[in-house]
Amino acid sequence: MPQNLTASNSETKLSVLITGGSGLIGRHLTSKLLDSGYKVSHLSRTGAKQGQIRVFKWSPDIEFIDPEALDGVDFIVHLAGANIGEKKWSKKRKLEIIESRVNSTKFLHEVVSKRGIILKAFISASATGFYGTSASTKIFNENDLPGNDYLGLVCKQWEEASDLFNNSGIRTVKIRNGIVLEKTDSALSKLMMPAKYGFLVKTGNGLQYMPWIHIIDLCNIYLEAIKESDMSGSFNATAPQSVTHAEFIKVLGRVMKKPVFPIPVPAFVLKTVLGEMADVVLKGNQVSSEKLMNTGFKFLYPNLEDALDNIING
């Protein structure tokens, strides 16, 4: 029977080291892990203390890491990476997005290998962008090949770097995050912004799919990846209810009690403003969460309206 690695199973707390711990997912996951009885520390480029969390400085670009950072660590959760939606995708920025993920993963593996650290698991973020940003009606699962666009390339190279841990005999889990729903610092907060003018807006033709997930469910998936010793490989972290952008905005309007402006933001406007990055908004895939649910995972928020109501009105 597979071992369930809950923090309470041991006399000493199991230790989780998180990269990107100050980001959206990292903050929520840290709280979840602490509440679940784990010891949590962060790797940060600044090394600035974050409440009760011990923070170790690292700088993968110059291959520096605090020598004490990995002492006694049982799990690494790797979330760090340059924000995909923060800046326009110049050639330089696109390189930063890839290198911040791939090189940091390779550096972590090098340090773990050289020091002979025995991890219980290495858990890395990825994204449903692995499948590319096509406008097809295909439902993608973990057996599908990566997309041939930029986001597909980013995720492919990131996951290949993560597989270095698997090749070293360390249980490796790659979590392909969907669009994370959270009120203050997520894609949802941007979609809600027009509401201050009294309405919501659609973008493009509205037919693009939005593989979404509530932040609570996403943190629970990462917790499962830590606890369940037979969980390995890639998993799509998206809610089972598949919706288009137009459907999403309609439900959001209903929850917020705001009308949807009848004229969408034209695709050419977004392409002019955002360049290639507009594809993230204008295209999207249907993504299956069947493999995850087959592990026994139960979503707390499988329904979009319930998820939005909890986040906005809860």
Regions found by a protein language model. Give the residues of each.
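Conserved Rossmann-fold NAD(P)-dependent oxidoreductase catalytic core, especially the SDR/UDP-sugar
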Residues: 106-149
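N-terminal Rossmann NAD(P)H-binding glycine-rich loop of SDR-like oxidoreductase domains
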Residues: 14-36
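NAD(P)H-binding glycine-rich loop region in Rossmannoid oxidoreductase-like domains
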Residues: 56-104
